[in-house]
């Protein structure tokens, strides 16, 4: 009984230490993604909305309907497979009011971009 309680206490303690670390890692991934995405916008939707594309995350940037950006062909495959496909799909079917979230790359995959 005491051994079981000891393991339960250790498990709870490890969870308490792991949760903040995971939250910090998630916030770090999001901030890195947003910074890169704003810098390398990958596509402009048919309604004049620019899209940023970056590893694992996609956000709708500022609506710029007042700029004539609809004619700029920026659908360039600058990211590997899934993110490139999502860039083209989102550029063709924009949904400005939504946040598009995709599975983030691992650190090893990020190095190959």
Curated annotation (Swiss-Prot):
Keyword field contains Repeat: yes
Compartment(s) where it occurs, according to its Swiss-Prot or TrEMBL record: Secreted
Signal peptide limits: 1-18
Swiss-Prot/TrEMBL Sequence repeat ranges: 32-37, 40-45, 46-49, 50-53, 59-65, 69-75
Coiled coil: none
Keywords assigned by UniProt, alphabetized: Repeat, Secreted, Signal
One GO CC term on file: extracellular region
Location of the region described as 2 X 7 AA approximate repeats in the Swiss-Prot/TrEMBL record: 59-75
2 X 4 AA approximate tandem repeats: annotated span: 46-53
Residue span of region 2 X 6 AA repeats: 32-45
Name of the protein this chain belongs to: Protein USP1
């Amino acid at each position: 009984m005491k051994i079981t309680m000891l393991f339960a206490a250790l498990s709870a303690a490890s969870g308490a230490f792991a949760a903040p670390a995971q939250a910090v890692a998630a916030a770090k991934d999001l901030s890195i993604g947003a910074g890169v995405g704003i810098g390398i916008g990958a596509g402009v939707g048919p309604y004049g909305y620019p899209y940023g594309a970056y590893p694992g995350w996609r956000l709708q940037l500022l609506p710029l309907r007042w700029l004539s950006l609809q004619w700029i062909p920026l659908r360039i495959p600058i990211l590997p497979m899934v993110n490139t496909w999502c860039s083209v799909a989102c550029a063709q079917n924009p949904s400005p009011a939504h946040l598009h979230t995709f599975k983030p790359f691992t650190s090893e995959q990020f190095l190959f971009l």
